[in-house]
Amino acid sequence: RTDEWLQTSLVIEGDLGFAQLTVVGSYYDRETFYQHDTQSYAAYFMYVIGAYYATYDFGTDPMGALTNDQKNESKALEVRLTGIGDRLSWTAGMFYMDSDEHWDFTSFVDGYASSTAFATWAGYAAYYGFTVPESDTWWFSAQTTSREDKAVFGEFDVKLTEQLSFLVGGRYYEV
């Protein structure tokens, strides 16, 4: 297994006289790769899901592994102004985040191309006019996700009496 990552953050605060400024930023970058032995459970697929699922018949003692290769990256920024007075307190700000994730997941079985499982999948594919190349990979999936969040927000708190105040706030965001 390899796991390399970097996570940073920075907070800047300052008094502007009329309001308190807070700026918060962060950055995250992680790359992971792991491999696990699948022999302990691949042999039992047929016993658990039954003979109707010949696509999982890897033989009596299959040896294999699974791998996951993944990369995550995100950046975030929030800027806030806060004012505190005798009767009125308020906050206004904005938020931005950009994140990306990509992973490849692969399961292998040694000799898969000569197994009943491969022959079954190849037969299904041939019926629909496709050819499945011989490989020890019996499962592959990949996903890439990108997300961008933006928001603005604000809040006002008005002190009406010593015992009563009126508070209103809101947030508008796009994902």
Please identify what each model-predicted range represents.
Residues 16, 27-31, 96-100, 172-174:
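Transmembrane beta-strands of outer-membrane beta-barrel pores
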Residues 6-10, 75-79, 148-156:
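Hydrophobic, lipid-facing positions within transmembrane beta-strands of outer-membrane proteins
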Residues 11-15, 20-26, 31-38:
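Membrane-embedded beta-barrel scaffold of Gram-negative outer-membrane proteins
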Residues 18-21, 87-90, 163-166:
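Repeated loop/turn-to-beta-strand initiation elements of outer-membrane beta-barrel proteins
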Residues 1, 37-67, 106-142:
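Solvent-exposed loop segments that connect transmembrane elements
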Residues 23-25, 92-94, 168:
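Membrane-embedded beta-strand positions of outer-membrane beta-barrel proteins
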Residues 1-4, 69-73, 100, 134-135, ...:
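Short sequence motifs at beta-strands and strand-loop junctions characteristic
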Residues 70-82, 86-99, 156:
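Conserved C-terminal beta-signal and adjacent last beta-strands/turns
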